UniProtKB/Swiss-Prot annotation:
PANTHER family tied to this protein: DNA REPAIR PROTEIN RECO
Gene3D superfamilies: Nucleic acid-binding proteins, Recombination protein O, C-terminal domain
Organism of derivation: Pseudomonas paraeruginosa (strain DSM 24068 / PA7)
Cited function: Involved in DNA repair and RecF pathway recombination.
GN (gene name): recO
Superkingdom of origin organism: Bacteria
Protein name per the record: DNA repair protein RecO
Length: 233
């Protein structure tokens, strides 16, 4: 049985396992991994919550490891309301899209930097779009926003459709799901002050992510929509 050196980590998801243990999905710079946390009803279980900076060691050679040590490594990021659902959304994307134990230091660093901004109440949409874009790029699914699939510069007044495996294709006929060139150029510059840029970026990221999510809806997105539709007291 091997022991992994201590690593900075975050809990993505945890669920009960057997009588007193938990099955936990962790995210580290060395990738996503799953481990059994024994004594989950004690101190370790109280630590194993999403958005808390942790330091952990694991043992085991197979895909399912065992937590050997788990300690706090910083101030918890306390998320509530829409920020909480946004954090859960990021966690679900990582669970669904990251291969197990595939090192992703850039994504980990971006995730660790995003959580405090969510906790601080920063505008959510730019943070989510930036994270989605970084995730797509690092996993090899990115595409250019300033040139089309033929290598021609994006024209502000032209219309484009996204071909997820290729990039942006110019079109001449109106159809659902198109993007204006001016919107794409605003996204390329991360200029969220441009009219319609954030809404277009949300549509674009949803189209870009869909083929890689396997057709299954995101639970966090459904929870958020249900919360918005629930009548308030």
């Amino acid at each position: 049985m091997t022991f992994a050196a201590a690593q900075a980590t975050y809990v993505l998801h945890s669920r009960p396992y057997k009588e007193t243990s938990a099955l936990v999905d962790f995210f580290t710079a060395q990738g996503r991994l799953r481990a059994v946390l024994r004594g989950a009803r004690g101190k370790a279980g109280a630590l194993a919550r999403p958005f808390v900076p942790l330091e952990a060691e694991w043992r085991g050679r197979g895909e399912l490891k065992t937590v050997a040590r788990l300690e706090s490594a910083g101030i918890p990021n306390l998320l509530s309301g829409q920020a909480l659902f946004s954090g859960l959304y990021l966690n679900e994307l990582l669970i669904r899209l990251l291969p197990a134990e595939d090192p992703q230091p850039e994504i980990f660093a971006h995730y660790a930097a995003t959580l405090p901004l969510l906790a601080a109440g920063r505008p959510l949409e730019p943070l989510l779009r930036a994270f989605e874009w970084r995730l797509l790029e690092q996993l090899g699914y990115g595409f250019a926003l300033d040139v089309d699939i033929h290598g021609r510069p994006i024209e502000p007044q032209a219309l484009y459709q996204l071909l997820p495996e290729a990039g942006l294709e110019p079109v001449t006929q109106l159809q659902p799901g198109l993007f204006q060139g001016v919107e794409l150029l605003s996204m390329a510059d991360a200029d969220w002050s441009a009219p319609g840029a954030l809404a277009a970026a949300k549509r674009l990221m949803r189209q870009a992510l869909a083929p890689h999510l396997g057709g299954r809806p995101l639970v966090s997105r459904e929870l958020f929509m249900n919360r918005k539709e629930s009548p308030r007291d």
